[in-house]
Amino acid sequence: MALTNEDIINAVSEMSVMQVVELIKAMEEKFGVTAAAATVAAAGPAAAAAEEQTEFTIVLAEAGDKKVNVIKVVRELTGLGLKEAKAVVDGAPGVVKEGASKEEAEAAKKALEEAGAKVELK
């Protein structure tokens, strides 16, 4: 009878830490490998500049004078109810949305600024 991945995971989850360490050592010897994490060379400045941020946090820095318009936009962006959206706007500065794509974040910033708010993307 062949063991499934689930059987193996269940067996390992029932082991003590010492038993898992012994299992890892035995696997290293059996297969001639090590369980050490691979080290990565430090990236130069060119590589760091090439990495572009993919997820953004939309932060409402200030609601401005037109709070009603800003509340409407916050509701559209987040799907929050009126009370929750008002709490976000009244609580500025605060996060409107996390994990937004670049396009989504830029569109949200534009909409909020058109409504009279001051917005930051992080």
Swiss-Prot record:
MF terms in GO: mRNA binding; structural constituent of ribosome
Keyword Ribonucleoprotein: yes
UniProt keywords, alphabetically: Ribonucleoprotein, Ribosomal protein
Similarity comment: family membership: Belongs to the bacterial ribosomal protein bL12 family.
Protein name, as recorded: Large ribosomal subunit protein bL12
Pfam families the UniProt entry points to: Ribosomal_L12, Ribosomal_L12_N
Binding partners and assembly: Homodimer. Part of the ribosomal stalk of the 50S ribosomal subunit. Forms a multimeric L10(L12)X complex, where L10 forms an elongated spine to which 2 to 4 L12 dimers bind in a sequential fashion. Binds GTP-bound translation factors.
Protein role: Forms part of the ribosomal stalk which helps the ribosome interact with GTP-bound translation factors. Is thus essential for accurate translation.
GO annotation, cellular component aspect: cytosolic large ribosomal subunit
GO biological process: translation
